[in-house]
Amino acid sequence: VIVKWDERRGVAKFISGQLTEPSDKSKTDLSIDFIRQHKVLFGVENPDKELALDNTNAAPRGRFVNFRQKKDGLDVIGGKITVRIENGMITTVANYFEPNIAVKTTPTISLEEATAIARREIISPKQTDTASLVVFHWEGKCYLSYRIDFRFNPGPEPSRYRVYINAHDGTIVLIENRVMHEGSATGSGIGVDGVLKSFDTYEKGGA
């Protein structure tokens, strides 16, 4: 068995080998039972509350079972655990779970206020497609955020913005233009030093 450790999170980030004996359990039950048995290794205090089944999909060998992370019922963006099962056995676990999230999950500002802030920032007349309250991990810190997706704007510079607004103080955590240009899309966000910075992002199909 190979175990790779994440020093920052203090958890196993990847495990591979024959991790279980062959089982007739469903892939979902086999996976969540394994996580329950080894929850300390993955940094999960309560798997039944902190994980939700996202989907299962085919792997080159076997099948992946994907769980997304939850915090007080909210999705934790990027937080997940993926289990690979071959012939009734778990063979790999990839752990992106973010432990010890210290963020209050009751917002201070409303969705309407957050949407108005986002609209002013990107100067967009377009309506929003979707908006949701999430926990967003960005540059080593977790934020309670409104994730606001704006509809496609064809020009003069095509855009489909996704904006994360801090749900406690109304500051902008991250702005992404999710339209795929040649190469990369652009985004900007507040760094750990409090400075707004730009970066390249990639998103398949511009979705």
PLM-predicted stretches and their roles:
Residues 1-207:
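Zymogen propeptides/activation segments of proteases
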